[in-house]
């Protein structure tokens, strides 16, 4: 089997080139870079963290520490992690662009541990990177859990799998070929 080359361009000095844990793994891990939050997003995150602390009966001391944090403290926190609250989606940058070979597509799948332990997975279930796309690969990561999660900068957030595709030409017809199954749909083949 011919081994194709996946060209990868780092768009950010801290970006990680995708890696495989084992030579025969299908997926290459994608790594998180910091999100550049707007001032409103930063304010929203602070308020959500305070609300969570209140709901969890945080002590007055804990709340004082939260509110006493300086802008510099918050900037350091935002540079080190990506805050993803329950049932929210965040576009997580990877800092890389890829040149998927013609005749292939890049599929962005969940990492099993992140999905099963923390409820984090691509919002679109499977992200697609077409062979002619050359901008930054980002992961629309959704938190399906009821707990907030902080993604560390440099954390593995998804996996990229390169798969062959068949480029069929769509043609409108008046009739389709008959098959034994016909129009029998969901559940028609039994349990």
Task: Give the location of each predicted region.
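DUTPase catalytic domain/fold
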Residues: 1-191
């Amino acid at each position: 089997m011919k081994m194709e080359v996946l060209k990868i361009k780092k768009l950010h000095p801290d970006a990680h080139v995708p890696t495989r844990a084992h030579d025969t793994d299908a997926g290459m891990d994608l790594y998180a870079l910091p999100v550049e939050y707007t001032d409103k997003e930063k304010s929203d995150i602070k308020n959500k963290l305070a609300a969570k602390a209140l709901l969890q009966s945080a002590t007055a001391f804990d709340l004082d520490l939260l509110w006493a944090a300086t802008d510099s403290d918050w900037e350091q926190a935002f540079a080190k992690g990506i805050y993803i609250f329950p049932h929210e989606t965040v576009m997580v940058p990877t800092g890389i662009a890829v040149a998927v070979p013609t005749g292939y597509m890049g599929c962005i799948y969940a990492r099993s541990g992140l999905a099963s332990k923390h409820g984090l997975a691509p919002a679109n279930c499977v992200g697609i990177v077409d062979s002619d796309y050359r901008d930054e690969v980002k992961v629309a990561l959704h938190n399906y859990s009821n707990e907030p999660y902080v993604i560390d900068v440099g954390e593995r957030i998804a996996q990229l799998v390169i798969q062959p595709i068949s480029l069929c030409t769509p043609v409108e017809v008046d009739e389709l070929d008959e098959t034994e199954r016909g129009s029998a749909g969901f559940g028609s083949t039994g349990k």
